[in-house]
A protein has these predicted regions:
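A glycine- and charged-residue-rich anion-binding loop/surface
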Residues: 1-880
Length: 880
């Protein structure tokens, strides 16, 4: 059995099963597609579940993959042992109703003994205790000796997860020798020691379970196998754990070079090295698959891993961002199998670096506060951090609760997690209430039920509709009617009003009868599909059961439609200019503008903004038809339609297409041709959160209004400057700037002269204390700039000097303290001295040892404060 590297083993496995008629599929993304039960792909079978369940047709009945996987339930244990890791690759061969047990068993044995040349006497096999068929195949057809076979129970050798396909499994173990074992006479396969390593699991999916203990033999049986690539590499390379296999070890060596440490020399250092090595592998692949750091979902998992790795870097002396450098090695070691990493290298590095920088700012403050909390707890003999303290660290300072728990645990301290969770929930409740209050809605929740079919929405094709009032609510209570002047919520059986959703605001308009008018301010809808029209009765009354005419504000709707279509064009343009990592992170579409939040790691340059804007306007000028279709979700995905992460979609979805330039799932209202947008203009680009940017833009008449506003501003500026034309503004502003610069230079020179003149006077009455000249002076009318200039001169003096200079103007005053180098060597500290002097007046201040400033409290006490300087200075300076 010869040594073989990770990349070689991966390729040998996939090639072997290709030779057996399997289709090699590339690894699926770590982000589950269409599976809301998973945060991240955690097994080789997970992305193929749709084929096993008959929800989709596989490209072949035989498939082989090497799947990227992330598992994080034991994240705190990663590093503490060499067994645990969050990232791994799972080799697998799968059959969807094609071959079954004998083929799976035969090929597994052939791959191990013929391709990898593993010694047969080192291999042991387990089967489910009642699976005589598999036992006989292994012993009678493959020839495995019975003393190398073991029958295990349901817990070990029967794969089942609730109801659905299930079945027995067979596992292949490698015997690493008695020197790796526990030394017990009865040590055997299944023992918890390190001698027998489970390498490959073959699952024979042959039953359909109802989840209640009843099993039916399936007509079409499946094979699902899984073998950890890193674990296989451990066996083939003769090493003890994944951190010692070639590709992982090379990553760790990079970390060692940065930290200037060596693995296997110090236990604490080894823990840190394992944490960093594992986590940077996970995060590199996660970012490569489109995960962005955030405070929720998989984005939080990514952020937690990065911050945990950065923290352990600090524990081994790495103070500056460094993980982004290690990304290079992770990609280098995996590029042959995952070439997309090389293409995204610059992007991945940047995301990691930015997150490290952000964490560095957070962690310094958080560590100081947490250290203070832990010190106080020890002094008080307590071992639990209060929920309030943990919440303050998390909410106010952004210090993660899991990091608080981990650091506390290292000192034998726990966190009151229940109280912390309660405070988090209280905050969420307040936020929800604030939102409801701001919405001005009497509809606080969905507790009020409407006993009628859901509202039929006709607004995609009509702006007005004849309808019937099916419910009226006032202050959250159902009523029969509302009268003039009352605010209410009106529910109709059918409506042209678009209900707020997908970031698009709800429609406004009028609901009326010949005798009454209800002005609709906005529209939303309940989870069960009833449209809620919020507004006020302007005239007459609105009564349940009566027929009404519902008409939207058509002009407002048209403006909103322009901005919504613009948001789609904007996302497509951003992906073209910045890259495919751009995804919608939120949006607000109104009649006045569109606000689009998207994933990106840095501010856009002026040139990038210009390119994005030009692309959108180019598509507007091309007059591309905007087509909306309702399609089965599978067909929509085949078209490449972009979905919003976290949004729930049914079997039939609405797809909005702008030619082949933009294809998105969307339930909003849009123009039928891009030409109707007129013009597109970006107003601003800013940061919303780490890794999320925001663009605000306008279209159509909004652009014209913007241009008119610009022209008005320029005309006003020209008039103020007494210019005949706005064309002269730029030149005139440049001239003014030059004049201001010259005046600043003259003021600086004048301040220097004033400073020099005053300096000649203030030393006349200087006292000497312990060999240090102590100077105080009241210099009323002197600006803070001149005071600072004088202080700079004093601190640069060669002789030992302490000076406090004061200036009072009306009810305000300033103090400047300066200490020369020679005075500081004798114990003087400007920041501490000025604090003492200012305190006499009721003021506050401070600063560095050489210079400091303070504000005066009571100006009439400045003289008294200056008189106290001699005594204060004497407390600081000492005789030689």
């Amino acid at each position: 059995m010869k040594w073989q590297g990770v990349n070689e083993l991966r390729e040998k496995y996939l090639s072997f099963f290709e030779s057996k008629g399997h289709t090699r599929l590339p690894s699926f993304s770590l982000i589950p597609q269409g599976d809301k039960s998973l945060l991240l792909i955690n097994s080789g079978m997970a992305p193929l579940k749709k084929y096993f369940l008959g929800q989709a047709v596989p490209p072949n009945t035989r498939v082989t993959t090497c799947q990227k996987c992330i598992r994080t339930p034991d994240i705190e244990r990663v590093g503490q042992t060499a067994r645990h890791g969050t990232y791994f690759e799972m080799l697998g061969n799968f059959s969807f109703g094609d071959y079954f047990k004998i083929e799976a068993i035969t090929w597994a044995w052939e791959f191990f003994t013929k391709v990898l040349e593993m010694p047969a006497d080192k291999l042991y096999v387990s089967v489910f205790e009642n699976d005589d068929e598999a036992y006989d195949m292994w012993t009678k057809q493959i020839g495995v000796a019975e003393d190398h076979m073991v029958r295990l129970g349901r817990e070990d050798n029967f794969w089942e997860h609730g109801s659905g396909p299930c079945g027995p499994c067979s596992e292949i173990y490698f015997d690493r020798g008695p020197e790796k074992g526990c030394g017990k006479p009865d040590c055997h396969v299944g023992c918890d020691c390190d001698r027998y390593v489970e390498v490959w699991n073959l699952v024979f999916s042959q039953f359909d379970s109802d989840g209640n203990g009843h099993y039916t033999e399936m007509e079409h049986k499946n094979i699902d196998t899984g073998m950890g690539l890193e674990r296989l590499a451990c066996v083939m390379q003769g090493v003890d754990n994944l951190f010692e296999v070639d590709t992982v070890q090379n990553i760790m060596k990079h970390v060692c070079r940065i930290a200037g440490v060596t693995y296997n020399e110090d236990d604490k250092t080894d823990v840190a090295l394992r944490v960093i090595t594992d986590h940077i592998r996970s995060t590199t692949f996660m970012i490569g698959d489109g995960v962005m750091p955030s405070n929720a979902g998989r984005g939080y998992v990514l952020r937690r891993l990065l911050r945990r790795a950065a923290r352990y870097g600090r524990l081994i002396g790495i103070k500056k961002p460094f993980l982004y450098e290690v990304v290079e090695t992770v990609i280098h070691e995996n590029a042959s199998a995952y070439p997309e990493l090389e293409e995204k290298k610059a992007y991945i590095r940047k995301i990691v670096e930015e997150e490290e920088k952000t964490f560095a700012k957070t962690v310094d403050k958080g560590f100081d506060l947490l250290s203070g909390i832990l010190t106080l707890l020890k002094e008080a003999g307590k071992t639990v951090i209060s929920g309030e303290d943990a919440f303050k660290l998390s909410d106010t300072y952004g210090f993660p609760i899991d990091l608080t728990e981990e650091i506390a645990a290292e000192q034998g301290v726990s966190v009151d997690r229940d109280r912390f969770a309660a405070l988090v929930e209280e905050q969420r409740t307040r936020a929800r209430q604030d939102y409801q209050n701001k919405a001005g809605s009497s509809w606080a929740d969905n507790s009020v039920k409407i006993d009628a079919p859901k509202t039929v929405f006709t607004g995609y094709t009509s702006e007005a509709e004849e309808a019937k009032v099916i419910a009226v609510f006032r202050d959250g209570e159902a009523v029969d009617a509302v009268a003039e002047g009352e605010t209410a919520v009106v529910v109709l059986d059918r409506t042209p009003f678009y209900a707020e959703s997908g970031g698009q605001i709800g429609d406004s308009g009028v609901i009326a009868t010949p005798e009454s008018t209800f002005s609709v301010e906005t529209t939303s809808k309940t989870e069960d599909g009833h449209f809620l029209h919020f507004g006020m009765v302007e005239e007459g009354e609105i009564r349940v059961g009566e027929s009404v005419s519902a008409k939207i504000d058509a002009e407002k709707r048209r403006k909103t439609m322009r901005n919504h279509t613009a948001a789609h064009l904007l996302q497509a343009a951003l992906r073209t200019v910045l890259g495919d990592h751009v995804h919608q992170a939120g949006q607000l579409v109104t009649d006045t503008r569109c606000r689009f939040d998207f994933s990106h790691f840095s501010a856009l340059t002026a040139e990038e903004i210009k390119q994005v804007e030009a692309l959108v306007n180019e598509k507007i000028l091309e007059a591309i038809p905007v087509v909306t279709k309702e399609l089965p979700i599978a067909e929509a995905k085949k078209l490449g339609a972009m979905a919003l992460f976290g949004e729930k979609y049914g079997d039939i979805v609405r797809v909005v297409s702008v030619g082949d330039y933009s294809v998105e799932f969307c339930g909003g209202t849009h123009v039928d041709n891009t030409a109707k947008l007129g013009l597109f203009r970006i107003l601003s680009e800013s940061s919303v959160a780490s890794g999320v940017r925001r663009i605000e833009a306008v279209t159509g008449t909004g652009v014209l209004e913007l241009l008119a506003s610009y022209e008005e501003t320029m005309a006003s500026a020209a008039k103020a400057m007494k210019l005949s034309s706005t064309n002269d503004l730029a030149a005139h502003c440049a001239s003014l700037m030059a004049e201001c610069k010259e005046k600043d230079r003259q003021i600086e020179a004048l301040n220097q002269k004033i400073s020099d003149a005053k300096m000649a006077v203030i030393f006349d009455n200087a006292k000497e204390i312990a060999g240090v000249k102590v100077v105080s002076a009241m210099l009323n009318g002197t600006t803070p700039q001149v005071l600072r200039k004088m202080g700079d001169t004093i601190k640069d003096m060669k002789e030992p000097v302490i000076a406090v200079l004061a200036s009072v103007s009306g009810e305000k005053g300033n103090l400047v303290c300066a200490c020369s180098e020679a005075a500081r060597q004798k114990g003087a500290h400007a920041g501490k001295i000025v604090q003492r002097v200012a305190a006499i007046t009721g003021g506050k201040g401070g600063g560095k040892p050489d210079s400091a400033m303070a504000g005066v409290g009571k100006t009439y006490m400045v003289d008294e404060a200056l008189m106290a300087l001699d005594a204060i200075a004497a407390e600081f300076v000492k005789e030689d």
